[in-house]
């Protein structure tokens, strides 16, 4: 088994019902934060972390994803003719970012099933999973932090942060033992527990590095919460066979699958743009004054 994390899976087969009607005919992963699709932020994180190949697990109405990361010859020709060199370079860079593959998840059977769809792509290697609802703004890319942890412990690593106690029922929650600095050893985990039953407020937040042993478990995994094949349930079984660690990553994480989180990300990323920042701040000040009146 290769000990280098080279491949990543990005599940993108969800229906995006929280963003209807915008997602009726387009992938929720293509909704833009400022002027870049959410999925592109995640792919850029993977590339910056050293990932060489990416498999996107798609569903129906996801053709826009493939089109975005493919070449657009007509657009390139038009930009070239109009001498828009910067835009042309930007468009060409998107299609040249990394080797991207696609597979269709024919039925929405859960995150565990989506990961299992990637079995032949992954082979016998450790791999990363990056969820499309989670964008992390960090000095060192979130996935790179986790790969550094994997390189030390050579086993499955879950990306975690603490969440508000009242929100534990939205996440996979861990029972852990503190090992060092930001590293924990996982003792147990539960998918979306009731607040009073949660073992902690340490939540898995959309980033995983997993050993290939998970595929044998997923093959026989019974449906869990919501009647779906839950990745957390399979990881719970994996924890009985090998050590699993959790890494409390640095950075601000945005849940862009939630409308408020999406808006927060849009504002913060807009403020990072030099060409937008000053005027946008003035606009926000006027809105703040309006709200206070």
Spans of features found by a protein language model:
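Conserved N-terminal catalytic core of the sugar/cofactor nucleotidyltransferase
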Residues: 2-10, 18, 36-126, 137
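Conserved alpha/beta core of the MobA/IspD/sugar-nucleotide pyrophosphorylase nucleotidyltransferase superfamily
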Residues: 3-5, 126, 176, 182-185, ...
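Active-site metal-binding loops of divalent metal-dependent hydrolases
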Residues: 15, 134
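Short catalytic helix/loop segments, enriched in acidic residues and glycine
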Residues: 25-40
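Short, conserved catalytic or adaptor-binding loops enriched in Gly and charged residues
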Residues: 88-99, 178-183, 237-239
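Active-site acidic Asp-centered loop
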Residues: 130-132
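Conserved core of the sugar-phosphate nucleotidyltransferase
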Residues: 137-216, 221, 225
